[in-house]
Amino acid sequence: MNSMKKKALAFAAAACAFGMLLSGCGSSNGDSTADKGSNVITAYNSEPQNPLIPGDCNETGGGKPLDLLFARLISFDAKGNASNEVAESIKSNDDATQYTIKLKDGWKFTDGTPVTAESFTKAWSYTANAKNAQLGSSFFSTIKGYDKLQDGDKLKGDEQLEGLKVVNDHEFTVDLNRSDSVFAVKVGYTAFAPLPESFFKDPKAFGEKPVGNGPYKFQSWDHDNQIVLVKNSDYKGNRVAKNDGVTFKVYTKDEAAYADIQSGSLDVMESVPASATKTFQKDSTVQAYNKAGSVIQQFTIPAKLKHFEADTEEGTLRRQAVSMAINRENICKKVLNGTGTPAADFTSPLTPGYSDSFKGSGNLKYNEKKAKELWAKANAISPWTSDDKLTFAYNADGGHEVIYTAVVNSINNVLGAGVAATNPYPTFNDYRTAVSDRKVQGAFRSGWQPDYPSAENYL
């Protein structure tokens, strides 16, 4: 928890990302956990969008605690290297259409029940089953029988993926519907975590008080305030906790979290408010770390948005024009003060196969003249009127306000006043709920922190 990421900024229809990891040096006010003699780490977080269920989380507010609560078949180190965690071995056939997975003996959930092969197969099937409406369902799409579990109206919710076969308590096989050489790495993602029998008896209650098998165990969740985890002394894996616990403190303003970092009442923060990007690395009250990372931030323009339809000439022209109208270099330099870099790919420089010169990457370069030409061509097809506006939705509690203000200003300066406007939501939870419920009109902020180290996961 001591490394800070300098996040790549993607604008393939994209906005900006920023954020590092900071740790507080503490202060003389006696409020820090270290001053109280406790070996508990306090970490910055947002309120999770959903209950704490591994297969129903696709954002960091829930992802960070879930990662510590659940051990998967494999785990990753800080450099993205994989090693077996619960798995004894994962072997594929020659064409990577079948995997045989063996488990280590002795693993238990924090309720004392054993982790078995069925703990994985039932959990994966539950997440894949459309009746259960889990956000991580698509991660199981390459497993045989996935398509049969997608008509939620005809399902009960307990149907199993036919490609999963339990051999015994410590072995199961996975038959895929196509070759998938990345599957052995993919299973390190949180959605592939095992679940105890108590989950299936009452998923709703479980989501409020999860039972895992990871390096930490759940203690409490005070909504919109904090999530408290304590060290799991029975954990048998390769991520043994070096402290007594982690308390995730929920913030709606980065500035408030940064002030707590400075005072010593917050230990770790992975973002920097815009007001501090010039000074944080010289601030004696914090320990700052600023290196290239694997996170990208972007915005999404819906495929059927008026004037931006993805399958039309007008839509293609306008998407290119908007992208070229955004001065990424200027935003990174003047708004983010060098704490981010413009993205030149849909992945990050740390991802195997990354390229900064792929076909079409010219659309990610600021080109005022070309942007105006493309916009004019689009207008010749279907005029942009005073009633039209491209809005950008984002959560205002994560430091995105200044970034999207700069994005909108850049677009309007090139394509004309009033073409674009901001559409902020108060909190990340409000924002993600609106996105998930498809209530956002216009473009919306998105981003990706890789679930496993592969270009496939970004794409």
Task: Identify the meaning behind each predicted range.
Residues 116-123, 169-175, 214-215, 243-245, ...:
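Alpha-helical secondary-structure segments
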Residues 21-24:
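C-terminal motif of bacterial Sec signal peptides marking the signal peptidase cleavage site
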Residues 199-207, 234-279, 294:
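Ligand-site clamp/hinge motif
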Residues 341-378, 397-402:
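Structural transition elements
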Residues 102, 119-122, 126-128, 132-196:
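Surface-exposed binding/hinge segments that line
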Residues 170, 176-241, 245:
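Gly/Pro-rich hinge or "lid" segments in bacterial periplasmic/extracellular proteins
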